[in-house]
Regions:
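C-terminal motif of bacterial Sec signal peptides marking the signal peptidase cleavage site
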Residues: 15-18
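Sec-dependent N-terminal signal peptides
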Residues: 6-13
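Long, polar low-complexity intrinsically disordered regions
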Residues: 6, 21-26
């Protein structure tokens, strides 16, 4: 009798704890994708770009190259896609292909996400913050 009672009690405990709750789980917001950010000093390779963008702080970077020639070729590809790229020469010696610049970090981040969505081949687009001298 004790064994039967113990078995029934054990079955009830296991059955009660294994049932899933029918409560709705709270909806969690989708996490914003990571956007790599780098802060560095750089110079504009064209005077016209410097004049038009010198007051901006946040730059959307679609490519980074050790060779200026490679950066120029990539810029041509970006022009064919409808962008107006600028080449920035970083303090580390890399030629950064920037397609937009902004005063606001939020606007720059939005643009990075938009590019990633519209141009999946450029999902590695990132954000460069101009370091003050």
């Amino acid at each position: 009798m004790k064994k039967t009672t113990l078995f029934i009690l054990l079955a009830l405990v296991i059955g009660a704890t294994s049932c899933k709750s029918k409560r709705m789980l709270p909806v969690t917001e989708r996490a914003e994708p990571d956007i790599p950010v780098r802060e560095e000093r750089f110079t504009f390779t064209r005077e016209a770009d410097r004049v038009s963008q010198q007051n901006n702080t946040f730059f959307v970077i679609m490519g980074s190259f050790q060779s200026r020639e490679n950066a120029d070729r990539f810029s041509e590809t970006l022009r064919e896609l409808g962008f107006s790229p600028s080449i920035l020469l970083s303090e580390t010696g890399f030629h950064r292909a920037s397609v937009n610049s902004f005063l606001s970090e939020d606007n720059a981040r939005s643009r990075v996400l938009q590019i990633r969505e519209e141009f999946p081949d450029y999902a590695d687009t990132w954000l460069l913050i101009k370091k003050d001298d």
